[in-house]
Amino acid sequence: MKKLLILLMALSLIAAACGDDDDTDAGDAGSDSGSSSEPADDSADDDMADDDMADDDMADESHSLSVEEINVAYFREWPTPNQFGQEDGTFDEAVGATINWLPFSSGGEMSEAMLAGDVDIAYSQGLTPFAGAINGGADLKLVGIAVSYAEADNCVAQESLGVTRDNAAEALAGATVMTPFGNVTHYKMLSMMEFLGVDLADLDIVQAEGGATTAAAFETGDIDVGCAFGGSVVTMLDSGGNLIMTGAEHESDIGIFTYDIVSIPTSFGEAHGDAVTAFLAATEDFNNAWAADPDTQNPVIAAAAGMEDVGNFLGGELWFDFPTIEDQLGPDWLGGNVAAAMQGQVETLNELSDGDPAIGDFAGAVDTSYLEAIG
């Protein structure tokens, strides 16, 4: 557990310095290539310069996006490499548009904001709330995988309960469990309790209003089990809590794989597909740059994520994995398993809580065209 706590604390430092757009010159098209003393030659040079400027203007137009600003939903205390360019505007420059970073506390809120027209791209939205929205008829598309993680999303029990895998059914009887509803944390909690033989009727399940609220309630002893993600998990462990099961056990024993996605309103993709592709391409570039020099970038990313005091969140061995575009398009992700995972999650939520019956086929909600358009 001590090793896992160290790993958990490692997950917390990656912060990004991102925000103001740096103005860049559109480029002088000067073609001062001749110093002839004859007027006729000067005129020819001027004509050539004019032609070069026209060519540059055309090039600028061909590389400009169909939008000047993109509203992107993201989570605080959830560090990702693209936050390295969030405050200094370098990510904006890589995309080719001003990025308005809008913080949200849940994936469900992200779906609602996209449907309301307030968000163009939801970055690192949980798969479960997205699947729930699709199951409810929302016209959204899953266009990429943001991050894969296991240990970063979990349930922490008060040490005084002495919960183990073997005694969970008895030790958790009558326990107060705080969790968000309708997201992957909720799905993992329900699946874990079923796997451990815990009767949900024996639990007092309270809806969380955010990870910080859950961590605070855990620290004061108002709840017995807190389920959250990111820095809130670290905070609860720092308060003396214990994991009921590790993320690795969720994967190996229950078959739960935890990852977040990139999603868009279908209408935004149809109108501004170039912007979606540019965002995904820039994110890939920033992921690669972080992987090449994480020690330099992690403190900057941590500051952007508001996690300076939580430790090196991205420094852990297995905290976050950022699949490449090639991997995302493969059968383990957008090529097949993602649609099946959405089906399974919706069915589980419907069976173990008050969810709607699954629609039967989620493949239509997955659109690989934007990733495929990246050269």
Annotated model-derived regions:
Residues 34-71:
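N-terminal low-complexity, Pro/Thr/Ser-rich intrinsically disordered segments
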Residues 60-208, 217, 224-230:
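Short, glycine-/small- and polar/acidic-enriched structural segments
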Residues 342-375:
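Conserved C-terminal helix/tail region of periplasmic/extracytoplasmic solute-binding proteins
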Residues 132-144, 235-250, 309:
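Ligand-binding "clamshell"
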Residues 271-352:
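Secondary-structure end/capping motifs
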Residues 14-17:
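C-terminal motif of bacterial Sec signal peptides marking the signal peptidase cleavage site
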Residues 213-304:
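Pocket-lining segment of extracytoplasmic ligand-binding domains
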Residues 19-38:
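Bacterial lipoprotein signal-peptidase II cleavage site
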